């Protein structure tokens, strides 16, 4: 098992997930990507995740379903962060209720995402 922090990017847009992969790999992280709820759950169960960057609008449904399934399997990531294009209080409240450490409005500038990731990973929450 690698000592590099494992970042799982749950994103169905290949350009976005590819950019996040490069961003995190170049800054010393081990990165997995998954385009769907099923793929995200499969990766997280097989390989414990330090930071989950979770798009709420996955092609096969509500991204928060990932957290529900991982909780059932006892495989929740150390830190889960929701990424959404919807800046609505009820969306943020749902994310928090499901255990998200933070909710970021897309698009998230790369520097901001990296700075926040360092904070989340150093605190573990």
State each model region's role.
Residues 11:
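Conserved acidic carboxylate
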Residues 33-51:
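Acidic, metal-coordinating helix/loop segments flanking the phosphotransfer/catalytic sites
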Residues 36, 62-65:
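Acidic catalytic/metal-coordinating carboxylates
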Residues 55, 84:
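Active-site residues of response regulator receiver
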Residues 59, 88, 107:
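The feature encodes the CheY-like receiver
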Residues 64-77:
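Short amphipathic alpha-helix used as the core "switch/output" element in two-component signaling
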Residues 90, 108-117:
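C-terminal output helix
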